[in-house]
A protein has these predicted regions:
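Conserved anion-binding
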Residues: 1-74, 78-84, 90-97
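Glycine-rich phosphate-binding active-site loops on the catalytic face of alpha/beta enzymes
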Residues: 2-13, 90-95, 99-134
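Catalytic-site microenvironment of enzymes
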Residues: 20, 127, 132-142
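A generic structural signal for ordered secondary structure
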Residues: 22-28, 118-120, 137-141
Length: 142
């Protein structure tokens, strides 16, 4: 069982959540894949710098993992080899981006992900025939 929390809640909140969660594994949300400009939110850091700060908080708090763009995989791995990484914004080769800004194709994801990385694929599967869409996404990785 997993529960997502915002890593921007800072260290004390993350630790309190971890304590309260019991056997539920916590995943810390870093920067949303739909965000491309943090300055609009009053955050002066670049996306990479903000992701780094939030992953370091998740790691320090001993969360089970993070939810972060697949574009951040190497950055997350440079901080922790043990965190699980759930990556939304995964698309088939020719899928629409919709509101997502920081995406990666499933083919590229499979080349860069390790055994603790998980693709999160939503709209590219549920828009239309889900079975056919899953087949198309998987076939696009060959």
């Amino acid at each position: 069982k997993y529960l997502t929390i915002h890593t921007s809640g800072d260290y004390e909140m993350l630790n309190a959540a971890k304590e309260a969660a019991g056997s539920i594994e916590l995943l810390g949300v870093t920067v949303l894949t739909s965000q491309s400009n943090l300055q609009n939110l009053g955050i002066k850091n670049s996306i990479k710098d903000q992701v780094k700060i939030l992953v370091e908080l998740a790691n320090k708090s001993k969360l089970a993992g993070v939810i972060s763009s697949a574009q951040d995989l190497s950055l997350v791995r440079s901080i922790s080899k043990n965190l699980k990484i759930f990556c939304p914004g995964i698309r088939g080769q020719n899928d629409k981006m919709n509101d997502q800004k920081r995406v990666m194709s499933y083919a590229d994801f499979t080349k860069t992900a390790d055994s603790k990385c998980f693709a999160v694929i939503g709209r590219p599967i549920i828009e239309g025939d889900p079975v056919q869409n899953i087949k198309k996404i998987i076939q696009s990785s060959y």
